Amino acid sequence: MHAPILETALLHHALTLLAPFATDDGSGDGGFTGPSLVDFFPQAFLFEGTPFEINRIMMVRFIAVAVLILLFWLGTRRMRMIPGRGQSLIEMTVGFVQSNIADGALGKEEGKRYMPLLATMFFMVFAMNVTGIVPGLNISGTSVIGVPLVLAVVAYIAFIYAGIKKQGMNFFKSSLFPAGVPPLLYIVVTPIEFLSTFILRPVTLTLRLLMNMIAGHMLLVLCFSATQFFLFTAGGLFGLFSIGTLAFGLIFTIFELLVALLQAYVFTYLTGVYIQLALVEEH
């Protein structure tokens, strides 16, 4: 007798975890309200009003970093010649970054040199991205500009450092005054090179990651909030629509996992490409 009530309560709780944002528009009529940009600016619950205030998104970032550190510690604390499952998984993922990103973008020699930076960046971006599909967290640490911007600045510093270390101050000359261009054309070419190399690279790195994570979050919240609304608020025949919204939400969750991985790959690979371009004497 009580089983259907219990199952309904559990389903409602599960959907609440998947769509933790309000689906009531506040008018009291139970109307549906979709996801909002307000989701990305939650109120602080610790140290409010100080430079160190902590809100929900900051907590998600702390959790992502802590879990990442814990997984690597557990997988590498007892390294063996014949690796266990944890060590094998870490070796496989690190090997993926080494062969497909570091070596692929920079070659073996330079790839080995910049591998620590690129691996750290890849796993950091992926860990921050994937929190968007974790029930109870439900938002990516990279869906607010802070982390994407910091990572883009790191990439920016890395390729400028690589260029100066390799070429000295000639790096700026070769970047702004490409060889083979008629001198008169430098009036046009140099401003374009300056914008594309020193301004647009960090901006596009930041915005590409940020916009993808925002869009993914909005669609997931829309799907699961709509499911909750159709099933528990609208009722009647509208409950049938919840089947479609739930199915689409689950499919899109898998898609978002792939997006999280792809964006980590793209961000890190482009960082490697920018470093490689800085190492070339004339480009």
Q: Where in the sequence are the language-model features?
A:
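Selective transmembrane helix interface/packing segments
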Residues: H2-H283
